[in-house]
Amino acid sequence: MQLSHIALGAVVVTGALMQGQGGGDPQFDRGRALFDKPFSLVEGLGAPEMNADSCRSCHQDPVIGGAGALELNVSLFGNDNGGNGPFTSLPGGPTVSKMFPPSIHGREEYPTGVNGADVFEQRQTPSVLGNGLIGQIPSTVITANEDVNDADQDGIFGIARRLTIAGNIEVGRFGWKAQIPRIADFVNDAMFNELGLTTPENGRGFSGITDADNVSDPEITQAEVDDITHFITMLSPPQRGGSTAPEVAAGEATFESIGCAKCHTPSLASPLGPVPLFSNLLLHNVMPPNFRGIAEPGAASGFYRTPPLWGIKDTAPYMHDGHAEDLRGAILAHFNEAEAVRIAYEQLSTTEQDALILFLEDL
């Protein structure tokens, strides 16, 4: 996969796109340099904690801005009273941390009683490729697909993540819990929680404005935040393989017929045209029975944003914590709202299952 640059306002979301390297966009180039830059302690890195020294350290597969391998997972923790609820956030618990590394299978193997915690959760590094197009999708398009009360009685709900930002309600669209509404918010949040770098206060609640080191705050200027935001915004989405094999076409038909497309919506409308992300950007619970995970306001334990499937073949392992090692494993890891879909997949012939995987690998 090659790094590409999109020209918003005249975007073609399939086919060849401009190359983003030296493509006549100085802000893109500055943003890329900052995304790629290893920061140092004298620049403010690492207070109160750091998971990496650069954005690219985690967002790297298969190109800069992509996903991260299992060993790059971060952890969160809290207390849910032994599974009886309610969920209680603990000091340090909402902060993504590499303090407790995952096992090679993505299982949470932590000592009990850390700060009173009895719930631990892994989070895998998501790709940011194509996030600029996702940011163009109107919130009303996302909320139009909600089915909070399962009106069609198919067992699949879908809830938009509503966030109160500076007194206003905004719809989240980025992050495993759809906890981030804008790319600039993602940049501010990651700078502080992943790198330990402070950014200017903007009233939206995602900036870390002060820390415990001796470096003057903010450690990242607003211009630098803007450059990184622009770089991410202009990264093109992964391009489909364009296979004309009949097996791929058959797999696409199966994807639709067994119900995968109910959540992994092939495209969502935007002012720039359809965005072929294969996600509805809604929260769903597809976790197994008795799953215990992190709860947030507006996103209960077990509820995660439907991840986009574009470029899915390059982002293994799968699910929020990377516990599915391949695409078949990811499908088989769907429960709860997706129970009927998983059962339908299990009842397919081997040939039909193989065709579905070929289709996914072509996205």
Q: What residues fall within each predicted segment?
A:
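Periplasmic c-type cytochrome electron-transfer domains
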Residues: 3-5, 14-363
